[in-house]
């Protein structure tokens, strides 16, 4: 979803290891006060985050946005639920997909687009243990091959 004029803030690498990403959706996120400055500084953590539907709206859970250090005393709860901003038809499409067995909504990346914080939300299906092992084995084999090629040339 990301195009030119975007700046990656954080990427959920754990999500790409634990899930097969079937589709992506760009969403806005409703942030309060100094949360935007904290996100811009990269002070967020979301390895176990997910999105859920409530009352026809998308809500992001388990995202920790640290308090902005240079702010005054008011700071929102760092672990609160945050509303995701998407069009009604996009939410309906996501709802149909999530109602299928095994699908979940996982935030893949946070990035800036035209000065706004955006979330790339993935429609994901969990990987089986043997899928993860195969991925690790393929990665290790590729690493070993590149090492042997480097040694051969030096």
Swiss-Prot record:
Entry keyword set: Cytoplasm, RNA-binding
Pfam families: SmpB (PF01668)
GO cellular component: cytosol
SUPFAM superfamilies: Small protein B (SmpB)
InterPro entries: SmpB, SsrA-bd_prot, SsrA-bd_prot_CS
Subcellular location field: Cytoplasm
Major location (coarse): cytoplasm
GO BP terms: trans-translation
Cited CDD domains: SmpB
Disulfide bonds: none
Any one GO MF annotation of this record: RNA binding
Function recorded in the entry: Required for rescue of stalled ribosomes mediated by trans-translation. Binds to transfer-messenger RNA (tmRNA), required for stable association of tmRNA with ribosomes. tmRNA and SmpB together mimic tRNA shape, replacing the anticodon stem-loop with SmpB. tmRNA is encoded by the ssrA gene; the 2 termini fold to resemble tRNA(Ala) and it encodes a 'tag peptide', a short internal open reading frame. During trans-translation Ala-aminoacylated tmRNA acts like a tRNA, entering the A-site of stalled ribosomes, displacing the stalled mRNA.
Recorded family membership: Belongs to the SmpB family.
Protein name per its UniProtKB record: SsrA-binding protein
Lineage: Bacteria, Pseudomonadati, Spirochaetota, Spirochaetia, Spirochaetales
Gene that encodes it: smpB
